[in-house]
A protein has these predicted regions:
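Bacterial N-terminal signal peptides that target proteins for export
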Residues: 1-9
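Extracytoplasmic beta-rich repeat domains
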Residues: 22-38, 64-80, 105-125, 148-166, ...
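Structural signature of WD-repeat beta-propellers
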Residues: 46, 90, 133, 174-175, ...
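Short coil/turn segments within WD40 beta-propeller repeats
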Residues: 49, 93, 136, 177-178, ...
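Short loop/turn segments that connect beta-strands within beta-propeller blades
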Residues: 55-59, 99-103, 142-146, 183-187, ...
Length: 371
């Protein structure tokens, strides 16, 4: 436990430096909010603390929040669209609900003050928005009005990851190396927790009865829910070259995990056996995305790689296509209908057609504002 506390202090101290120079880059870091696409509109947080809504077809800026006179805060959370609202958490410690059509502020929680930095993306389930905050508390807010339904204070210190909801249970991983389960019905801890020797870098991913999560000790953990011991840690022989910062994804019994050492690994979910790996040559900060049988990753250098996971791979995978957007990428991205939407660290939005392997759109957010 003492080692975990020492590692936690080191992580909090070094993390801003890692985010600024994840792969040797020298830019000043802003938020790492990624884009989402809903009904032909891209919603994204920008490096300068705005939320923008941009029409994909016309590149027209539909709205931005706050306006040029508003107070801005760093935005690390990717927006969420639910009903007629878009939700976003800020590093200054508020959660905002904005109208889809105009970006008008519907509500803010808390009304005054701060709940501590919101770094992990909130989730919305059954008209409730769940927020993990750096004050060590999970908040449940009414999605329509922003009223507090309940909150649960953990003995975990900072929460910088996104909560995961499966059924009537919420799971959250912490910077001090715990995973907790909370009941959405009784609005409190269920009693099980898992403790590792280092903090968890990624949000927990639930697949069947197991949790998969990356740690600052440079291992990826597989944990059976309810157990106090891990099923396996990956790599099996020695730690990886860096952190498993991005959350993995699991599909048909295979875990796909990107690492800051630049490697993408396919791992057998039950045994932890490595099936294949790919060396991107640059840190993988964003979680992979699966579209049908195509697995998509971006690395910090701005290269998009596409793999066909329906084919057998031996030891080292070879991507079907690679495309460089020419800008570094540290935020999540989204994919739909054969297109990948990326927000670069140059504050531009890129659209990549993965079928032809080309950038079909790319424009600065500032240009959209002038259109």
């Amino acid at each position: 436990m003492k080692r975990a506390k020492i590692l936690l202090l080191a992580i909090i101290t070094l993390l801003p430096l890692v985010l600024i120079s994840c792969g040797g880059a020298t830019q000043t870091t802003g938020g790492w909010s990624g884009p989402i696409v809903e009904d032909g509109i891209i919603y994204a947080g920008t490096r300068d603390g705005r939320v923008v809504a941009v029409n994909v077809s016309s590149r027209k800026l539909e709205w931005e929040w706050p306006d040029t006179t508003g107070l801005r805060s760093l935005i690390y959370t990717t927006p969420i669209v639910h009903g007629d609202l878009v939700y976003v958490g800020t590093y200054s410690g508020q959660v905002y609900a904005l109208t889809l059509d105009r970006g008008a502020e519907r509500w803010v929680y808390p009304r005054t003050g701060s709940i501590g930095a919101v770094v992990g993306r909130p989730v919305v389930v059954n008209e409730t928005i769940y927020v993990a905050s750096s004050d060590g508390t999970v908040y449940a807010l009414d999605a329509t009005y922003g009223d507090l339904k309940w909150k649960c204070e953990l003995e975990a210190g900072k929460l910088w990851t996104s909560p995961t909801v499966m059924g009537d249970t919420l799971y959250v991983s912490t910077l001090d190396g715990h995973i907790y389960d909370l009941s959405l019905e009784t609005e409190g801890l269920l009693g099980w927790s898992f403790e590792a020797e280092a903090g968890f870098a990624s949000s927990p991913v639930v697949y069947e009865d197991d949790i998969y999560v990356g740690s600052f000790d440079r291992y990826l953990y597989a944990i059976e829910i309810g157990s106090n011991a891990s099923m396996w840690k990956f790599p099996q022989q020695k730690p990886a070259g860096n952190w498993f910062w991005a959350s993995p994804i699991v599909n048909e019994g295979i875990v796909y995990a990107g690492c800051l050492d630049g490697r993408l690994c396919a791992i057998e979910a039950r045994t932890g056996e490595k099936l294949w790996e790919f060396d991107a040559g640059s840190p993988i900060v964003s979680s992979p995305v699966l579209m049908d049988t195509l697995l998509i990753i971006t690395d910090e250098s701005g290269t998009v790689c596409v793999f066909d996971v329906s084919t057998e791979s031996q030891d080292e995978a070879v991507p079907l296509r690679t495309v460089s957007i020419g800008a570094s990428v540290r935020s999540s991205f989204c994919a739909q209908n054969g297109l990948v939407y990326i927000r670069g660290e140059d504050n531009s939005i890129y659209v990549v057609d993965i079928e032809i392997g080309e950038i079909v759109e790319g424009w600065p957010v500032s240009l959209a504002a002038q259109t």
